[in-house]
Amino acid sequence: MDKNELVQKAKLAEQAERYDDMAACMKSVTEQGAELSNEERNLLSVAYKNVVGARRSSWRVVSSIEQKTEGAEKKQQMAREYREKIETELRDICNDVLSLLEKFLIPNRSQPESKVFYLKMKGDYYRYLAEVAAGDDKKGIVDQSQQAYQEAFEISKKEMQPTHPIRLGLALNFSVFYYEILNSPEKACSLAKTAFDEAIAELDTLSEESYKDSTLIMQLLRDNLTLWTSDTQGDEAEAGEGGEN
């Protein structure tokens, strides 16, 4: 199937909410080796975000059930085995994406915006791996995530307006990384607040086409700040849950 047909099929799969099919199409497009257009890049991102998101959600539910079944050995064993099955799927998906990033996407990009987008993606998928990692593996995975986010963050500060949705989405996810993975609420709040304040100060630079995406992510940053600075702690919002790239 040629590239245009694969892209069309990916769009069809998205409308049908068949994200595994959508991801398979965009994986094939990526493996053809050409640099992806913005539209193709977003299709790839949306597909895998949904594919991995379903497993992350399942993993949280089953982990919670596993913890609650202490004392009921058979039930706990069943929950543990099921969690491990979901973990295997989740790891395979993350490794798939990380392989595409390393082999094709990061080397083939020509614009700083694309580099930030793909390095953010690399940080995200190592973060998802870190959520389910344990023991000796975890530190290396966490380091990989932090390095990718940090590199993306440095480039975004040099090359992008504070209101750019990719720069804002990166700040959002990097702050979630500090809060959830590194257990550093002060650093998470500082990063999120700085990103929000810098964007507010330059609202007049917002382009019409990115207005909706940027303001949505700013709202998510503010929601997280409210959550993190209050006594109640729930699930943090994350870029992509609403309408980020």
Swiss-Prot record:
The modification N6-acetyllysine is found at residues 3, 68. One of its GO terms (cellular component) is melanosome. The record marks 56, 127 as: Interaction with phosphoserine on interacting protein. Keywords: Acetylation, Cytoplasm, Phosphoprotein. One of its GO terms (biological process) is signal transduction. The modification Phosphoserine is found at residues 58, 184, 207, 210. SUPFAM superfamilies: 14-3-3 protein. Highly expressed in brain (at protein level). The modification N-acetylmethionine is found at residue 1. The modification Phosphothreonine is found at residue 232. InterPro entries: 14-3-3, 14-3-3_CS, 14-3-3_dom_sf, 14-3-3_domain. It is found in: Cytoplasm; Melanosome. GO terms for molecular function: phosphoserine residue binding; protein sequestering activity. The delta, brain-specific form differs from the zeta form in being phosphorylated. Phosphorylation on Ser-184 by MAPK8; promotes dissociation of BAX and translocation of BAX to mitochondria. Phosphorylation on Thr-232; inhibits binding of RAF1. Phosphorylated on Ser-58 by PKA and protein kinase C delta type catalytic subunit in a sphingosine-dependent fashion. Phosphorylation on Ser-58 by PKA; disrupts homodimerization and heterodimerization with YHAE and TP53. Its main location: cytoplasm. Adapter protein implicated in the regulation of a large spectrum of both general and specialized signaling pathways. Binds to a large number of partners, usually by recognition of a phosphoserine or phosphothreonine motif. Binding generally results in the modulation of the activity of the binding partner. Promotes cytosolic retention and inactivation of TFEB transcription factor by binding to phosphorylated TFEB. Induces ARHGEF7 activity on RAC1 as well as lamellipodia and membrane ruffle formation. In neurons, regulates spine maturation through the modulation of ARHGEF7 activity. Belongs to the 14-3-3 family. Interacts with CDK16 and BSPRY. Interacts with WEE1 (C-terminal). Interacts with SAMSN1. Interacts with MLF1 (phosphorylated form); the interaction retains it in the cytoplasm. Interacts with Thr-phosphorylated ITGB2. Interacts with BCL2L11. Homodimer. Heterodimerizes with YWHAE. Homo- and heterodimerization is inhibited by phosphorylation on Ser-58. Interacts with FOXO4, NOXA1, SSH1 and ARHGEF2. Interacts with Pseudomonas aeruginosa exoS (unphosphorylated form). Interacts with BAX; the interaction occurs in the cytoplasm. This is 14-3-3 protein zeta/delta.
